[in-house]
Amino acid sequence: MTTLNFPSVLVPLVGLVFPAIAMASLFLHVQKNKIV
């Protein structure tokens, strides 16, 4: 049961973490451009 449950927990986690990192890096890039 644990092996079946692990991917179903991992997929939404990656689906939320990856866009969050992408948005954070984009935000930092915009902030850097505004300061310069």
Curated annotation (Swiss-Prot):
Stretches of the chain forming a coiled coil according to its record: none
Keywords assigned by UniProt, alphabetized: Chloroplast, Membrane, Photosynthesis, Photosystem I, Plastid, Thylakoid, Transmembrane, Transmembrane helix
One CC-aspect GO term: chloroplast thylakoid membrane
Membrane topology recorded in Swiss-Prot or TrEMBL: Single-pass membrane protein
Transmembrane segments: 8-28
One Pfam family here: PSI_8
Intracellular or extracellular location(s): Plastid, Chloroplast thylakoid membrane
Domain of life according to the entry: Eukaryota
InterPro entries for this protein: PSI_PsaI, PSI_PsaI_sf
Gene Ontology BP annotations: photosynthesis
Function: May help in the organization of the PsaL subunit.
Family assignment from sequence similarity: Belongs to the PsaI family.
PANTHER family linked: PHOTOSYSTEM I REACTION CENTER SUBUNIT VIII, PTHR35775
Designated name of the protein: Photosystem I reaction center subunit VIII
Biological source species: Helianthus annuus
